[in-house]
Structures are given as structure tokens and as C-alpha cells.
Curated annotation (Swiss-Prot):
The gene is pyrH. Catalyzes the reversible phosphorylation of UMP to UDP. It is found in: Cytoplasm. GO terms for cellular component: cytosol. This is Uridylate kinase. GO terms for biological process: 'de novo' CTP biosynthetic process; UDP biosynthetic process. The keyword ATP-binding applies. It comes from the Bacteria. GO terms for molecular function: ATP binding; UMP kinase activity. Belongs to the UMP kinase family. It comes from Haemophilus influenzae (strain PittGG). Its EC number is 2.7.4.22. HAMAP family: PyrH_B. Keywords: Allosteric enzyme, ATP-binding, Cytoplasm, Kinase, Nucleotide-binding, Pyrimidine biosynthesis, Transferase. Pathway: Pyrimidine metabolism; CTP biosynthesis via de novo pathway; UDP from UMP (UMPK route): step 1/1.
């Protein structure tokens, strides 16, 4: 088996990645496959932190457009990430993987409150740590959370799992001739106005020198290939 090139990673999974074909909620089969792929990394000795989005359940920005107060909508979105985190923790437990779910705000009896030193301790013990509830503040995306937590836990890389094979020069769903980039600099992403993640999240990663790799989590084995250094997806650094 190939050796990992990263010791510690922050894996960002969108809420949409958990959806089934009906486009709603959580597909247990997809969740279980992700848990098995994460287990592979743990067995290779990789320390894994996970940030989940909540877009499969709620999106604060969309609720705000419908007339709801944005702060209230974002709070609902944060709770959606906790629900996804509970589902992921359960799948990992059933795959015999030790996992800890942490929330940015107190949810006594459901999960632990985020604590930086405790998270580091758990990672060193090879427990998967799931970070939920975003940053705990409205107006910040879960991409921002992923970059923030990745920097805090001193991850080697933020792995952004998507439904496409990496970063393209245009939308591959609309243009079959879209070009896939293998390597990009932070400056190139900004200059070309490529849609990697929101600007706040991206500039946070850039300012702290946090590499980002974008790949297709829908491809079985892609996560392992990224971690073992194969040319999978797009690398930004």
C-alpha cells in the first residue's frame, strides 16, 4: 500500500455530498462509504479532522432570501451541520472508528464543545474529530470553518471534497470542454476568478499558507489517492 504524504488532514465535506439521488437529507449508503474511506486513512496512520456542511438540510443564505432573518437562518444552518456530524459519527462508530464530535457552541448531552487542545489530543490518539456548528458565528461559511479549523489544528492540507474532479476554468456541467487544472497558485485562483470557495475562506488559507486540494469524493478511492500523493484533483498552494 502506498504511504500517505500527509500526517494530518482537514477533510471538508459539503452537505450536498451526503444526499442521495432524491436530493434530500442524508443517504446512509453514501455516509457509510465515506466512513469506510476515512477508516482507510486512519489505518494508514493519518490524523483526520472533518468539517461538514449543512446544505442538504438548511442554508441560511437561502432562508434569508425567502425573508427570514439571516442570523436566524445561519443558526439553523449551524444546527444542520451538527445533525450531519451526528450521522457521520454514527457511521464511523459502526465502521469501528473512534470519533469525537465537537460543536462550536454548547450542546450538552449531544456532543462536546469545541476545545482546541482537546481536539489536538484526540487527533494524536488517532481519533477522527468532527467539527460542527461552523465557527459559531453567522455570516461565515463552512468553507471558512474548514480553513480556520485546519489552521488551528496545524493540518498539512485542507481537502475539499466536491462533486467534480477538481477546479475547472469554467463550469464542467455547462461546458464539456472545460479545462481541469492540476496545480494552481492562490494568486491564479483570484486572478482567474475561479470558484474554489468563498473569498473569506480562501484568503484565510492563503494568508496562513494552508494548501488546498479539491477532488471528487464521488469517485470511490479518490480520497486515498489524494492522501497518497497521486495526481488526483487540483492542488492550490
Amino acid at each position: 500500500m502506498s504511504q500517505p504524504i500527509y500526517k494530518r488532514i482537514l477533510l471538508k465535506l459539503s452537505g450536498e455530498a451526503l444526499q442521495g439521488e432524491d436530493g434530500l437529507g442524508i443517504d446512509p449508503a453514501i455516509l457509510d462509504r465515506m466512513a469506510v474511506e476515512i477508516k482507510e486513512l486512519v489505518e494508514m496512520g493519518v490524523e483526520v479532522g472533518v468539517v461538514l456542511g449543512g446544505g442538504n438540510l438548511f442554508r441560511g443564505a437561502k432562508l434569508a432570501k425567502a425573508g427570514m432573518n439571516r442570523v436566524v437562518g445561519d443558526h439553523m444552518g449551524m444546527l444542520a451541520t451538527v445533525m450531519n456530524g451526528l450521522a457521520m459519527r454514527d457511521s464511523l462508530f459502526r465502521a469501528d472508528v473512534n470519533a469525537k464530535l465537537m460543536s462550536a457552541f454548547q450542546l450538552n448531552g449531544i456532543c462536546d464543545t469545541y476545545n482546541w487542545s482537546e481536539a489536538i489530543k484526540m487527533l494524536r490518539e488517532k481519533r477522527v474529530v468532527i467539527f460542527s456548528a461552523g465557527t459559531g458565528n453567522p455570516f461565515f461559511t463552512t468553507d471558512s470553518t474548514a480553513c480556520l479549523r485546519g489552521i488551528e489544528i496545524e493540518a498539512d492540507v485542507v481537502l475539499k471534497a466536491t462533486k467534480v474532479d477538481g477546479v475547472y476554468d469554467c463550469d464542467p456541467a455547462k461546458n464539456p470542454d472545460a479545462k481541469l487544472y492540476k496545480n494552481l497558485t492562490y494568486a491564479e485562483v483570484i486572478d482567474k476568478e475561479l470558484q474554489v470557495m468563498d473569498l473569506s475562506a480562501f484568503t484565510l488559507a492563503r494568508d496562513h499558507g494552508m494548501p488546498i486540494r479539491v477532488f471528487n469524493m464521488g469517485k470511490p478511492g479518490a480520497l486515498r489517492q489524494v492522501v497518497t500523493g497521486t495526481e488526483e484533483g487540483t492542488t492550490i498552494c
